[in-house]
């Protein structure tokens, strides 16, 4: 199971070039693709996919905030829909999902935690944190960086708490979107 991540040329304030060949995949893109893939594999019974390769396309059309975390959340919905289609066609005996997964970005701006920072907030952030969690509340991915100065454990706890709340809301939205698929 893998994911391909790409930002369309006008997804950012200034146009960026396309990454056309696999050899041209830049470090940031490769890192994001690996993160998305790890998150999806963490909630999938890979033995239940025996004989199948699943590739999820994550195309960013507007990059104003946490694109990698938005891709994790959306990629899970796409995966669930694809697996439900395979089960519905008789190609899978059951849907091999163990749980849901969603992700958010959290930042520290002016000493305060912010959820899902926009570009301007991200540019001012003292700390950048990406969090991915299962629907059962288990951590899949925690990536964090202090931009200029170290930060206290209390600030990390506040960001993790805010991130958890955001992920719980996204998980509910995923469940609503996938309600008719009978994923059990």
Predicted regions and their residues:
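A generic structural signal for short beta-strands and their flanking turns/coil linkers
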Residues: 1-3, 50-54, 100-102
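Glycine-rich, flexible beta-strand/loop modules in the N-terminal catalytic cores of phosphate-handling
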Residues: 1-49, 139-156, 161
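Preference for bulky hydrophobic residues occupying beta-strand positions
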Residues: 3-5, 56-58, 106, 131
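Beta-hairpin (beta-strand-turn-beta-strand) motif
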Residues: 6-8, 61, 109
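A structural signal for small-residue-enriched, beta-sheet-centric alpha/beta enzyme cores
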Residues: 27, 47-48, 66-70, 80-84, ...
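Glycine-rich anion/phosphate-binding loop at the beta-strand->alpha-helix junction
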Residues: 31-39, 50-88
